[in-house]
Amino acid sequence: MAHFAQLDENNVVTQVIVVGNSDTADVNGVESESIGVAFCQSLLGAETNWKQTSYNANMRGNYAGIGMTFMTGVATLGVGSTDVFVPQQPYASWTISTTQARWEAPLTEPTLTDEQQAAGSYYTWDESAYQADNTTGWTLTTPE
């Protein structure tokens, strides 16, 4: 089975459908994304925009999900393509990782101490704090 993501005019994933392998293959049985795209367009309209995604292969960084963005020309190592699916950017200061298809904070998340871990503490990103002072951003939260 093959999976294809439909993109809107902003390259945001609106749905993902499953397509039979035979609907992505030529007469010789060779699978091709373009054949799968044509099949999807025959089902849901010639003007629709489709990109193949995969659970099993690292072909585009992440398996596409509704709301994710398809980005082209992203220089990420360890990803089989420079065209990747990424979640929505969580904060304005975060950038795409150069090693994986995911967003990274501009500051490394601090490591929790053993005591903090035992207390169930965790760090959250505070964009306002970072914008006010770009040497801060991670806030330690401890449940009561």
What are these regions (language model features)?
Residues M1-E144:
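Interaction-interface detector
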